[in-house]
Design a protein with these regions (language model features):
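Extreme N-terminal, non-catalytic leader segments
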Residues: 2-33
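Short gly/ser/thr-rich secondary-structure transition/capping motifs
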Residues: 17-20, 112-116, 163-167
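Conserved P-loop
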Residues: 33-123
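Generic hydrophobic/packing signal
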Residues: 38, 52-56, 84, 128, ...
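Generic detector of well-ordered alpha-helical packing
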Residues: 67, 134-135
Length: 181
């Protein structure tokens, strides 16, 4: 039997559904997102690797480029390189955090090489997602030109490719173009 509470609830939910349907009608459908994981706490790379593992689980080609942590071992790197390298190539391009290397010219060279690899992987439309792990550090220390990175993401990222960028202190310009941050 329909009670007054049930009727009110149904009416309220019908209004919510109509409002939600109106919002969803304005959405342009699926597209590849630019996602920035930044902040002071831990978990930025872990969250991004969760997204990569989801791609792997659904047999969606993806790729990882590590900008800074290249010399460091991690469970994510071990699992991907040993078990899923065919669907998710993993490029550890850095040599460690800059305060460990203390060689700015070498850090810039490594960051530029990582960025070239990243662009190649992003342009490859087979990749549904590309993770640029710790790129925000490379941008913060000006190892890469923020305007060049922004221009590439805006102008050359294929429409259905997701690009995930991690690291503390994300540049304001990067946050401005992000779909999720």
């Amino acid at each position: 039997p329909m009670t007054d509470d049930t009727a009110r609830h149904n009416e309220k939910m019908a209004k919510k559904k109509a409002a939600r349907d109106k919002i969803m009608a304005t959405k342009s459908g699926e597209k590849g997102l630019i996602v920035v994981h930044t902040g002071k706490g831990k978990g930025k790379s872990s969250a991004a690797f969760g997204m990569i593992f989801r791609c792997i689980a659904w047999d969606m080609p993806c790729a990882v480029v590590q900008f800074i942590k290249g010399g460091m071992e991690s469970g994510e790197k071990k699992l991907i390189t040993e078990k899923f390298a065919d669907i998710c190539p993993f490029y550890a391009m850095g040599e460690g955090f800059t305060w460990e290397t203390q060689d700015r010219a070498r850090d810039i060279e490594m960051a530029e090489a990582a960025w070239e690899k990243a662009k190649e992987l992003i342009r490859d439309t087979r990749n549904k997602m590309v993770l640029l792990d710790e790129i925000n550090i490379a941008l913060r220390y000006e190892y890469l030109d923020i305007d060049a990175v922004i221009a590439f993401l805006k102008d050359e990222k294929p429409p259905m490719t997701h690009v995930v960028l991690t690291g503390r202190n994300a540049h304001e310009k990067l946050l401005d173009i992000a779909d999720l941050a």
